[in-house]
Regions:
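Conserved, mostly hydrophobic/aromatic
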Residues: 22, 28, 59, 91, ...
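Shared catalytic-loop signature of beta/alpha-barrel
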Residues: 196, 207-224, 229-327
Length: 356
């Protein structure tokens, strides 16, 4: 699927997304999941081609022919495979969607969600010029988004933030480095504190918890961890050792709803707010993100946005829209509450495999 506009981070630039969809038949009821792995292993060791192989060769054989009392039982089987959380999450999410449909209830309600609408922020990629960045922020604020996140990297950090604060002194603003810095860069990151940021997301190495602990000691601005958190155990270490004050929970990165709910509860018990990050999902993945964001400790605006921000044509109906107040209504229909557009899925499909 082709994005409406290219999206650039400190790691790479995306223009087209190859998306793996999982369609699971659970006792005659169809559930849908989406694998959020990217084209290349820059955000995560996983990427599209490896996820396909792991789903087909390892995860499917583990669940084939098994009887489950609930979707939450699937994780114990999938956990036998080390890593590959994005592939696991796609399969597990499809089973959760099917269970909610079997019970004729929304997925949000099934997982314990409490919200009828969720607060929305927006993530803006690195732009060629500051004027283009300002124009993009103006457009998103006019659309109603409650929080602005911009991507930063060395050489594109202080000046973009300074310019935005001059133009928009009162907006909720945060930055995301996607691991672009090292602990030696702490004086530069300290300078960002003068711009009253909500948080600095994943400033240091994707597997470097220790340096984040040391950095958070030096900063008053909260650190939010993303790439560092793949398991409940890593989340516990980050929270209890002081590596962060906020955690971004992504279904794909941590392996699905079962682990997401555990991390959510852990953070809630420790007074650590969470929010839902985005991975350039299609409407199916976005619907799952909406459901996840209804859990009570998702108290900060997430990266769940309107369909039209990324896709001229999406594969669900109705498309997701954002209110002028910067919120999305939670679907109340069974399962994810949005219907896959089978005609468009067929149109965009380049590879299909039927596993029985």
């Amino acid at each position: 699927m082709k994005l409406v506009a290219p999206f650039e981070t400190s790691m790479d630039r995306s223009e087209i997304r190859r998306i793996i969809l999982v369609e699971a038949n659970v006792d005659g009821v169809i559930g849908w999941g989406e694998c959020v792995a990217g084209e290349s292993p820059f955000y995560s060791p996983e990427y599209t081609d490896t996820a396909w192989l792991v789903l087909r060769n390892f995860l499917w054989p583990l669940v084939k022919g098994q009887q489950f009392k609930a979707a939450s039982d699937v994780w114990a089987l999938l956990a036998q495979v080390r890593g590959h959380n994005m592939a696991k999450a796609a399969l597990e999410a499809a089973v959760w969607d099917a269970e909610a449909k079997q019970k004729d209830m929304s997925l949000a309600k099934l997982i314990g969600g409490t919200r009828e609408e969720i607060a929305c922020g927006v993530s803006i990629g690195i732009k060629p010029s500051l004027d283009e960045l300002v124009a993009a922020v103006k457009e998103e604020l006019a659309a109603g988004y409650q929080r602005i996140k911009i991507k930063i990297k060395p050489g594109s950090d202080l000046e973009p933030v300074r310019r935005l604060r001059q133009e928009f002194p009162r907006i909720k603003l945060m930055v995301d480095a996607n691991s672009a810095y090292t602990l030696e860069d702490w004086p530069l990151l300290k300078q960002l504190e003068g711009f009253y940021l909500m948080m600095i997301e994943q400033p240091l190495g994707w597997d470097d918890l220790y340096s984040h602990i040391e950095l958070q000691k030096k900063l008053d601005t909260p650190i939010c961890l993303d790439e560092c958190i793949h398991t409940e155990e890593q989340a516990r270490a980050a929270v209890e050792l002081g590596a962060c004050k906020i955690i971004n929970i992504k279904l794909g990165r941590i392996g699905g709803y079962t682990v997401a709910r555990r991390i959510h509860d852990l953070c809630q018990d420790h007074g650590v707010p969470v929010w839902c990050g985005g991975m350039l999902e299609s409407g199916i993945g976005r619907a799952h993100n909406i459901a996840l964001s209804t859990l009570p400790n998702f108290t900060l605006p997430g990266d769940v946005t309107a369909t039209k921000r990324y896709w001229a044509e999406d594969i669900i109906s109705p498309e997701v829209t954002v209110s002028p107040q910067g919120t999305i209504r939670v679907p109340v229909g069974p399962g994810i509450g949005l219907k896959p557009r089978l005609d468009l899925i067929e149109k965009f499909t380049v590879r299909k495999e039927h596993l029985v």
